[in-house]
Amino acid sequence: DPAVPPALRPSPVRRPLPPELPREERCLEPQEPACPACGGDLKPLGEDVSEQLELIKSAFKVIKIRRKKKACARCDVIVQVPAPSRPIERGIAGPGLLARLADAVCDYVMSMGKVHVDDTPVDVLQPGKGKPKTGPLWVYVRDDRNAGSTQPPAVWFAYSPDRKGAHPQTHLAGFSGLLQADAYAGFNPLYEEGHIREVGCMAHARRKIHDIHVRHPSPTTTEALRRIGELYAIEADIRGRPAEERQQVREARSRPILVGLESWVREKLTTLSRQADTAKAFNYLMNHWRALCYYAGDGWAEIDNNIAENALRVISLGRKNYLFFGSDSGGDRAALMYTLIGSCKLNGVEPEAYLRHVLAIIADHPINKIKELLPWNLTIPAE
C-alpha cells in the first residue's frame, strides 16, 4: 500500500537458499576483551545468522555467517562484529557472484586495442587510525562511437589501496594497443615495453594554459587557446565519422595547425622566464608533444582523454552521498558496482532494472555464457 510508510510495511519473506548447496560456516567473534563502555566482563548473548550466495571456482556455495554477540554484565552494552559488506544492500549475492560479470566487462574493454584510462582519489577508512587514507579508483573505458563504431561502449573500474604504478601496470598486463591517458609516470614502463602506444590528452595540456589565462590573461595565452580551439573545431566537424575519414581530415587540416603551434610555442619559450607559469605550461606541452600529436595520424585515437574523465563523473556524484569507503574491500565492492552501473549508463540501460533482473537469474545461468548477461546483450523484460 503506497499510503503505508516504508518503515511500517511488513518485510517480504525471502525463500531460504537451496539446502543441497554446499555450505561453509564463518564465525565472527567480537574482538573486544572487555566492555568498551565501562570495562566490565562480557558474557555470551547469542548470535545473528545470515547466509549469502557465493561463487567459488565456478561452483556455488552458501556462506553461513554467525556473528556472535556479547553483553556486558555490568552495563548491558552489546558488542558484535559488523556484518560483512555486500555488493547489494540486504542482497544474498556475494561479491564473487557479480565479480564474474565485472571480469567479463574488463575482458571486453581490453580486447579492442584502444583504452582510455584515468583515476580519481577516494577516502578510505583505516581501522585503528584517526584519519582516512586516499585510495584511487582507476577507470578503463572502451568507447569508439566518435570514430563511427557501432560496438557497445563499456567501462571497467578497479580500486587500489595506493596510487603506485604497479596497479595500472597489473591491470594492463595483457593489453596491447593505444593507451589514451594523462602523463602519469606510472604508465611509462608500459610504453617502454613496446606493445602499448602512448596517446596524450590535449584537454589536459589546454587546461594548464586556460588556468593561467583565467588568473592572468595575456596575448600569449589568448593566442595559444585560439590555436588549440581550431583543433577542437575540426574534431567537432568529424565526430562520428569513420576512422579512415577522420584520419584524412586530420592530416589535411589538423596537422598544419599542430606544426604551426609547435613552432610558435618553441619561439615563445625563448622569450619567457623559466619560472613563469606560462613557460611551465608550454614546457608541459612540448615535453609530451609526440603523444599529444599522435591522434592526427590515427582516426581511432581521440584528441583528448575526456571519454575517461566523463566516466569518472559517477564517482563525483557518489561523493555527494557518502563520505568514504569503509575499507579496501569496500573499495573493491564499489569498483565492481561502478563497473556495472557505468556500463549500463553508457548503453542506455537503466541500472536498477538491470541489476534486479541479473540478480534474479545469474545463479541459474551457465558460467561459460556469462557474456550473455552483459548490459548490452541482455534483454530486460518489462515490469
PLM segments and residue spans:
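Short, flexible loop/hinge motifs at secondary-structure junctions
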Residues: 1-89, 116-117, 147-149
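Gly/Pro-rich turn-and-neighbor structural signature
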Residues: 2, 14, 31-32, 36, ...
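Beta-sheet entry/capping signal
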Residues: 34-35, 41, 69, 112-115, ...
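Short, conserved catalytic/metal-binding motifs centered on acidic residues
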Residues: 35, 72, 101-103, 118-120, ...
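Short helix/loop capping segments that flank catalytic or ligand/cofactor-binding pockets
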Residues: 44-46, 80-83, 124-126, 148-150, ...
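Structured secondary-structure scaffolds
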Residues: 87, 92-103
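Conserved beta-strand -> loop -> alpha-helix junction used to position metal-binding or nucleic-acid-contacting
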Residues: 114, 183, 192-226
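Acidic/histidine-rich catalytic cores and adjacent linkers
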Residues: 176-177, 181-186, 221-383
